From Swiss-Prot:
Gene Ontology cellular component terms for the protein in this record: chloroplast
Keyword check for tRNA-binding: no
Protein name: Maturase K
InterPro entries: Domain_X, Maturase_MatK, Maturase_MatK_N
Length: 510
C-alpha cells in the first residue's frame, strides 16, 4: 500500500486528480485482491480462492456496466453475497473486488489531498492518542466559559458526496462512476436505517469508512478556516489588560463594589478563545466570550452545514453548555470545571504581594455506574453489584482465567487513569478480582479461602505483567486522589465507552 502511494506521487494522473485511467490498472486490483482475501473468512478453503478464476477483463466489463446501469438493472455492489461465491463464481465477488479497488484509489488520493491541507494549516495538529485530547482540555479549556458539543450529521444524500468529490476529482467519468455507486449504496439501506446512511455495515466497512473520512475532512477543511477567521476578528484592546482573564470573576465575588458597576463593557472588550477537538462523530468547540457570541457561533455552524452540504442539523446535535454549571459527556468521561481559588505570592524587592486568582479546575470523572451496568451485562456481577463467578470460563486453564480478568482490569484502569474519582475504581477492581477467585474456586470445586491459601500472594500476580503493576500502583491509596496520569499510547476507544455512548445518544434523541 505504501509503494502504491509512493507511485501515486509520481504519476501524472494522481497529481492532476484524473482518477478514471487508474481504475483500469491491473496492479491496483492485485492490491485490492490481497485486501479482499485478508478480510475473507478464515474458514473458507484456500483451494477455492478467487485468484484461481480472477479475470481482469471481467473487472473492466463490470466497471462499464456500472456506469451504464439504471435503476431497473442494478449490479448489486452492496447486496449480501452468496456464502459459496468462490464455488459458484458469483458476480458479487467481482463487485466487491471492484469496490475494493475503487476504495484504494480514493483513499490514496484523499490522503494526498489531506496531507497538503494539514501542512497548509498553521497550528493544526492531528494526533492519534485519545488521552492527548484530555491534556489539551486540561490546559486550555479552563480559560473558556462555554463549550459547544457537536455531533456531526450522519444522513447525507449521495449528490452531496459527489459535490464533495468534485472539489478534488476533475474527470467526469470518475464522478459518474462514483455517482452510480453512491446511489446504489443509499438504496441498499432500509427505510428505518436511511437516516444512518454512513453507519458502516459489516460487509463493506472499508468503503463506508472512506465515505465518513472524506466527509469529515471536507467539513473540517471549511470549518477550521472559518474558526480561524472568527478568531482573528478579535478586539485588540484586550492586550492592554494582562489580568483580564480573572478580572470579571473578581468583580462577581467581591461584594464591596457598588451595585451600579456593570460588567457589560468588560464583556465587549473580550474576544473569544476558540479550541476545537474531535474524535469520531463528536466534536467540542470551547469558547471564551459572551453568550451572544457563542449563539452567533452556533448560528454560523447551522448556516455552514446548510450552505455547503444542504443539511438541516437537528437542534440536539449542537448544544451550548456553560462550563461552570454543568457536566458534559465526552469519550467515556463526565467532564466538569469547578471554580478554584489559587493564592499567588509575589516578592518584589522589599514588598510581598499576595493575590487570589480564581480559576477553573478540570475534573474528569469515570462513569462508575455505566461501568457497573456493563459488568452486569457481561455477568461479572449482579444488579446490586455483588460479584459472581464466570462458569463459562471454568474449562480454561488457571493462567487463561487470570489473563482474561487481568485484561479487563487493565483496559478499564488504563483508560480511566486520569479520572479523579479513584474510590469508585477501587470498587471496580474489587468486583473484577473477586469473580476471578470465585471462578477458580468453582473450577477446583473448593472455596475462595482454600484457593487463596493454596495460591497465596501469587493468585493475582503470577501472570500479571509489569505494566499492570505500574497501572495499579498509580491507583494505590497512597497516591493523591487529585493526581491524574494520562497515557499517550491509547489510540483506540474503550469498549465500555462504545456501550455507554449508545445509551447516551438514545437519551439525547428522545
Amino acid at each position: 500500500m505504501d509503494e502504491f502511494q509512493r507511485y501515486g506521487n509520481k504519476h501524472k494522473s494522481w497529481q492532476q486528480c484524473f482518477l478514471y485511467p487508474l481504475f483500469f490498472r491491473e496492479d491496483l486490483y492485485t492490491i485490492a485482491h490481497d485486501l479482499y482475501l485478508d478480510k475473507s473468512s478464515s474458514s473458507e478453503p484456500t483451494e477455492l480462492s478467487i485468484s484461481n478464476f480472477f479475470s481482469f477483463p471481467t473487472v473492466k466489463r463490470l466497471i462499464r456496466r456500472i456506469r451504464q446501469q439504471n435503476d431497473s438493472n442494478s449490479i448489486g455492489l452492496f447486496r449480501n453475497c452468496d456464502p459459496n461465491r468462490f464455488i459458484n463464481r458469483n458476480r458479487n465477488s467481482y463487485s466487491e473486488l471492484v469496490l475494493e479497488g475503487l476504495t484504494v484509489i480514493l483513499e490514496v488520493s484523499l490522503a494526498m489531498q489531506s496531507k497538503h491541507f494539514i501542512e497548509g494549516m498553521d497550528g493544526w495538529k492531528s494526533i492519534r492518542s485519545i488521552h492527548c485530547i484530555f491534556t489539551l482540555m486540561e490546559d486550555k479549556f479552563p480559560y473558556s466559559n462555554y463549550v459547544s458539543d457537536i455531533r456531526v450529521p450522519y444522513s447525507i444524500h449521495p449528490e452531496i458526496l459527489v459535490r464533495t468529490f468534485r472539489r478534488w476529482i476533475r474527470d467526469a467519468p470518475s464522478l459518474h462512476l462514483l455517482r452510480s455507486i453512491l446511489h446504489e449504496w443509499r438504496n441498499s439501506f432500509s427505510a428505518e436505517n436511511l437516516q444512518k446512511a454512513l453507519v458502516p455495515p459489516r460487509e463493506n466497512r472499508r468503503f463506508s469508512l472512506f465515505l465518513w473520512n472524506s466527509y469529515v475532512y471536507e467539513c473540517e477543511s471549511f470549518l477550521v478556516s472559518l474558526l480561524k477567521q472568527f478568531y482573528h476578528s478579535r478586539s485588540l484592546l484586550y492586550g492592554s489588560f494582562p489580568d483580564r482573564t480573572h478580572f470579571d470573576k473578581k468583580i462577581k465575588h467581591i461584594v464591596i463594589f457598588p451595585v451600579k458597576i456593570s460588567t457589560k463593557r468588560i464583556w465587549l472588550l473580550k474576544y473569544p478563545f476558540i479550541y476545537y477537538v474531535r474524535y469520531g462523530e463528536r466534536s467540542l468547540i470551547a469558547l471564551k466570550g459572551t453568550h451572544l457570541q457563542v449563539k452567533r457561533c452556533r448560528y454560523h455552524l447551522f448556516n455552514f452545514w446548510q450552505y455547503y452540504f444542504h443539511l438541516w442539523s437537528q437542534p440536539y446535535r449542537v448544544c451550548i453548555l456553560e462550563l461552570s454549571k454543568i457536566y458534559f459527556y465526552f469519550l467515556g468521561h463526565f467532564l466538569s470545571f469547578k471554580m478554584k481559588t489559587l493564592v499567588v505570592r509575589t516578592k518584589m524587592l522589599d514588598d510581598l504581594l499576595i493575590s487570589d486568582i480564581i480559576a477553573n479546575e478540570f475534573n474528569p470523572i469515570a462513569p462508575i455506574r455505566s461501568i457497573l451496568l456493563y459488568l452486569t451485562k457481561e455477568r461479572f456481577c449482579d444488579i446490586s453489584g455483588q460479584p459472581i463467578s464466570r462458569l463459562s470460563w471454568t474449562n480454561l486453564s488457571d493462567d487463561d482465567i487470570l489473563d482474561r480478568f487481568d485484561r479487563m482490569c487493565r483496559n478499564i484502569f488504563h483508560y480511566y487513569s486520569g479520572s479523579i474519582n479513584k474510590d469508585g475504581l477501587y470498587y471496580i477492581k474489587y468486583i473484577l478480582l473477586l469473580p476471578c477467585a470465585k471462578t477458580l474456586a468453582c473450577k477446583h470445586k473448593s472455596t475462595i479461602r482454600v484457593v487463596r491459601e493454596e495460591s497465596g500472594s501469587e493468585l493475582f500476580t503470577k501472570s500479571f505483567s509489569k505494566e499492570r503493576e505500574f497501572i495499579y500502583s498509580s491507583f494505590s491509596k497512597t497516591c493523591s486522589q487529585r493526581e491524574r496520569n494520562w497515557n499517550s499510547d491509547i489510540i483506540q476507544i474503550n469498549i465500555l465507552v462504545n456501550y455507554w455512548q449508545k445509551i447516551h445518544n438514545k437519551q439525547i434523541e428522545k
